Amino acid sequence: MVKKNFIPSVSLVRRDLPTLVTTTTSSTALSKPTSSVVSETSSKSLPSLTSSAFSTSSGATSSSSLIVASITPPSTAGNPFILNAADKPNGTVYIAVGAVIGAIFISILIWWLVSSYLSRRFTMTNSYANDSKNLYRGHHKHSSSLQSNPFDINDEKSYMQDDWDSMSQLESSQYEDAASPFNPIQDPFTDNRRSLFISPTLQVSQYEKSHSRHQSKDTNIFIDDPSLYVGTYLEEEEEEERKLNLNRPQRAASPERKEKKINSMEGYHKRNQSSLGLIPVASATSNTSSPKKAHKRQAPSMFLDDVLNGREII
């Protein structure tokens, strides 16, 4: 048995195009000024498709809603946590910061002006005092009534001290030898050199000799009693003992030891108010007038000691 395909018969009926009906409903409800609700509803119905064999019908409905909110700041009335800036200008923070920075700069400027004024005044005061001291030194007592100097009262004691210092310098300069301004060593015996021998102790010996000569001049002014010349006799005895003990040369004393000894003797005489031993030694002149053969009989250490003490001239 052969099975054949069965094809149903369909009868088509001609008809017109369907009509489309759309219904739109919109409702707006406004309850408060702070919110608004908009709702739209649309309903659409599709035409139904009918046929002799099949019959179908369909429908669709859609709805949408949108909520829009408006922001409003809270009221500042009676609220302690919110700054009421309605009565304040704009940029209050910037104005405050600028005022603080300006105050700092103004304080620095005032400090600089005050310090410069004080330093200038101090400098002028010192310079005027020094100028007046140099100008009126020695005769400020006679010219104080002619000029009004505000520093005379405060510096009277210093002026008197300067006068005494100048007088003492004048007295000491009377006994000083003339020195060449072009010689940095200020040695008056360099031009009178009689040999080519150069000694490292020459400057020390010449200085000690000149110092002893000035000291002898000062002592000769105030000492007139011949009974005080006992020191010369002691020096002569020591010189004789040195000549006898040529076989036992003594150790040469350094300039520092001699200087300390002189200073100690001066302190002793100042404490006891005595001038014994400060008389110039007469044997120094006798050694200079002695013949040169005496140097050959002396030991080198003794000769160096005499040079350091100013008794010998190279």
Curated annotation (Swiss-Prot):
TM spans (from-to): 93-113
Region of interest (Disordered), ranges: 32-60, 240-309
UniProt keyword list: Membrane, Phosphoprotein, Transmembrane, Transmembrane helix, Vacuole
Signal keyword on record: no
Membrane topology: Single-pass membrane protein
Location relative to the cell: Vacuole membrane
Gene Ontology CC entries for this record: cellular bud neck; fungal-type vacuole; vacuolar membrane
Biased composition (Basic and acidic residues): 254-269
InterPro entries according to UniProt: PRM (IPR051009)
Main location: membrane
In-chain residues carrying the UniProt-annotated modification Phosphoserine: 148, 254, 274
Family statement drawn from the similarity comment of this UniProt entry: Belongs to the PRM5 family.
Protein name: Vacuolar membrane protein SCRG_03194
Species name: Saccharomyces cerevisiae (strain RM11-1a) (Baker's yeast)
